[in-house]
Amino acid sequence: MATVVRRNERSWAIDLISKINLIAKNNDLVIKKAGGENTISTGRGNTMFPDVVLYGNVEQSVILQGWELKMPDVPIEDETFIKDAQRKAIALNLNSCLIWNFTYAVLYVREEGNSFKKIKQWNATNHIHTREDVETYRSDWEKQLEEIITEVNGYFVSGQFRNAPLGQIISESTITTLIQRNKTIIAESLRANAFRDSVMAAFIDSWWLSVKAEYAQDETDKYKAYAKTIILNWANRILFAHIIKHKQNGAMIVDEIDYDKTPNEANAIFKKITEKCDFYNVFSAVRYNEALPELSWQDFVEFSNFLSSNGIDHLNQETLQNILEGSVATSKRAINGQYTTPTELAKLLVRLTVKNWSDTILDCCCGTGTIPKEAIQIKKTQMTAKEAVETVWACDKNNYPLQVANISMTEPDTINIANRLFQHNALTLSIGEKITITNPETGGNMILALPAFGAVVSNLPFVPFEIIPADDKDEISKMPFVDILDGRSDLYCYIATKIADVIKPEGTLGIIVSNSWLGTNAGIKLMEALKQEYNIKQVHISGQGRWFKNADVVTTILVLEKKKNSNCVDTDFWLWQLSLEQLAENPDAENTLVNSALLSSELDRSVSKLSKYSQSQIESILNLNVCYNALFHDVNWLIDIKDRIIPINKVYNVFRGSRRGWDALFYPQRGEHRIEPQYLKKVLINARNVTKLVATADKDAFCCGVSIEELKKRGHSGALSWIEKFAEQRNGVGKPLPAVLKRTGLEWYELQDKEIAEVFTMMNPDQRLFFAKFETPSFVNQRLIGLTHKAEYPDEELNHALLNSMFTMFYIEASGFGRGLGVLDVNKDNIAKCYMLNPNLVSATDRQNILSAFEKLKARQIMKVSEELKDEIRLDFEHIVLQSFGMEDYFDKIKSSLLSMQETRATARE
C-alpha cells in the first residue's frame, strides 16, 4: 500500500525530538526522553498516535504527553489541528496535550467529560511565519523549546498532569480506539466486496447465523460484527507477537510489518511466526481479514510501529501479563458482549466442579478462555506449569474466539508450552479422537488423543431452540436420548447430555446455563435426560443479583456426576447470599461457599443456604405442580400437607383473556366513538389500577360479530364507522389490518366475549400476588387470567378467600420462575395447575371465621407481598385459615419460602 512521507514536517519533528532528548539529558527532569520518529502521515489525514511523545523513563514505558506539530502555514487556532491533539490524548489516557506550529505553542489540560481548556500559550517565536523562517530562526525556537519543556515539566512535578503506563494504554485504550476508528469503514468494505463475491457473502451469512446470539444487544449488523472480528484478529496478533518476541525469537519478524507490506504479506509473516512459535489460534488469520481499506491497514501498521518504538521490551512480566489480560478483556467485550463469563464466576464454577485437581479438565465451549485460564491458575498452585497446561483442554465450535482464548490461557511461565486448545463442536467430541497442535519448542506437529476427562466445566452457549444451526440439529438427531428431551429444548440441553461421552465414570460436569429450565416442561424433561447419565449433585442460583450484569439473562450452575452405578443420591439446591463482587473481595466467604457445596453442608447461612432433597422427595414435590425453582427455598414441608390441598382447576375453570391484538380497535376510548351499546361489553384490560380484592371492569370492549351487510341493514352507523376507521389501516410492517386480524369463522373485526370471568389474576405478576373478584362477572383481555367456579364448588365467597391466602401466593411463586428483569413468568396453565387449600375441608364454623377475617382484608387496599405479611389484618386472616386446616405450625415455613422466592426473584433486577 502507498506510503505518504511527511518530508518537511517529519525532518523538523526529528530535530525537535533530538533537541528535547538533549534537554532531558542535561537536566534532572520528570521528562526523561522524547520519541515518535516512526510516525508516518497516512492518506487518512490523521494518525492514531502523536507526532512527539514525552516519556517519564528512558525505557519509554511511561508516557507523559503527546505533541502535535505543524508548520507555520497551519494556524494555531486550526480546529482540526487542535482536535487531533486532543483526540490522541484521550486515546492515550492522558490529561494534557500540546500543539506547536513553530510560531506559537499552546498547552491544553483535559477536564471532565473529555473537554479541554487552554492553560498556556507561548508567543516568543511569533515572528516565524513561513517554512523558511523555521530554518532561519532555529536558535529562537530551540530557546523557546527549552522554556516549554521546563514549564511542562513543572506541571508533572506538581501532579497537575498525569502519566499513563504503556501497559494501560495498550490494553485499555488502543484496541478500543482501533475498533472505534475502523469498524464502520471495514464493514462498508466487506459489504461492497460481498456484493461482488457471492462466496464471501455466503460465508459471512453462515458465520453470522452461528454467532448471532453471542452479539445480542451489541451488534445487529453482521458486517460490523465481522469487522470487529477482523480488527481484533489483527490487533491481538500484532500485540502478542511484540510481547513474546524477546523470549520467542521467531516472532522478531513482526518488526518487518511496515507501510510497504500488504495485509496478505503480513499474514505470511504471522504464518512464519506460527511455524516457529506455535500459538496457531493466536496467529492464524480469520477469513477475509485481508479485505481492508487502506486507511485501516495504515492504522494496524502504525499500531505495530508504536509497539516496536516504545518500551514494550522493557516491561516486566507482571506488566506484560496485565497487558494481555487487559487486551483479552477488551476483546471479550467486543466479541462476547454481555455473555462473557465473569472471572469470579469462572473460578467458582471450576472449584465447585473439580474433585481431583491432578486429573484432566475440559471446557467444551471455551469462548474466550476465562474458565480454562482459571483452571490452569488453580492447578499451578500445586503442579508445575507444564503439568497444569497439559491437563487443561479447551475447544469451541467457532474459530473466532480461540485467538483470545489462547492469549488468555498463556502466561510468561507457560509461553513455551502448547495449550490444549482446538476448534471442535462439543456435540461431536469422542474419547481417543486425534487432535493436532503445534509444539512451540520444535515447531513440529503434536498429534494428541483426546482423553477421558475427570471434569468438564463450561459456560454453555445461550442459543434458543429456534436458532439452533442446521449442522447442530443433524448431530442432535443422532443422540440416543433425544426423544427424552423436549423439542423446544435450547442448545445447552443437548450439549449437557452429549458431553457425558468424554467424562470418566464418577467424573463431574459443571455448567452455567440459563434458568429457563427451572420453570418449564422442557426443564423437567432435561432433568430426566440428564439422570440417564448423571447424578444431579448440586444446583446453584444467586440470591444477590444476576451473575451476568450486562444481560437480561438469569443463570444457574449445575454440578453433575457421571453415573458409575444406579444408586440415587441427594440433590443440593444452593441459594447464594453474596454477590460475585462480594465473594471476589472476601476469600474466606468464597472458600466457605465452595467448601459448603463440597461437604454438602450449610456452613454459614449468611454465605449460602442449602435445601437438600432425596430423589423421591423431588419427585413428590414436582408432582404437586411446583417447578424446580421452588426447590431452592426449603419446601419439604409441602409433602406433609398434600392431603389438605387441591388443584385450582378442580375448583375453577381457568382461561386466558381474549387475545386479538390491535387494542385501538377492540378497546375504544370513551368519547371517541358512536358505537351502539349492544356492541360494547365491560372489560378489564389490566390489573395495574386494581387496588382491592373486589373490582369493577372499567373499560369498553368492541364485541361485534355482525357482518358489514347486516350492520347496514340495521342502520347501525356507529359500529360501521368504527370498523371503517380501521379497514384501511396497516400494522407496523405494512400489512392491512383486515388481513392481519382475520380468523377462521370470525369477522376480522370480531372480538368474542364467550368467557366471562368471576375472578381474575395477572399474567406475569411482580410484587403483588392476588385474585380479585368482579362485582359483576366481566370480560378480561389477554393480559389477565380469568376464573369461573365449577358447580362442584359453589361456595364462591369461601373459594375467593382461600385463593387469597398466603399459601396460594406461595404457589403462584412456586409455579413460575423469574425472568431477567425480575418479573414472574406465570401463565394460565401455571395458575390452573397451582394448588389451593381444599374448600371441602372447611367446617361451617371455620368458614364463618375465615369469611369474617376476609371481609377486613377486602376492605383495605392490596399491598406488596412483603408488606402484606407484616400487616395485622393479613396475619390474623392467615392464622385463622391455617388453624382451620390444622396447619398453624406451618405458618413460618410457608412465609419463609414465599418471601425467599420473592426476594430472590427481585434481585434479578440488580
Where are the language model's segments positioned?
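Polybasic, glycine- and aromatic-enriched phosphate-binding surface used to engage nucleic acids
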Residues: 619, 626-856, 862
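Acidic-basic catalytic patches of nuclease active cores, encompassing PD-(D/E)XK
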Residues: 1-41
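Charged, often flexible domain-edge or linker segments that flank or initiate folded functional domains
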Residues: 50, 55-57, 61-86, 90-291, ...
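Signature of N6-adenine DNA methyltransferases within the class I
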Residues: 44-47, 78, 92, 104, ...
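P-loop NTPase catalytic cores that bind/hydrolyze ATP
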Residues: 223-251, 458-459, 554-556, 657, ...
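Active-site metal-binding core of divalent-cation-utilizing nuclease and nuclease-like domains
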Residues: 29-60
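Amphipathic alpha-helical coiled-coil/heptad-repeat segments
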Residues: 845-910
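Class I S-adenosyl-L-methionine
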Residues: 247, 277-352, 818
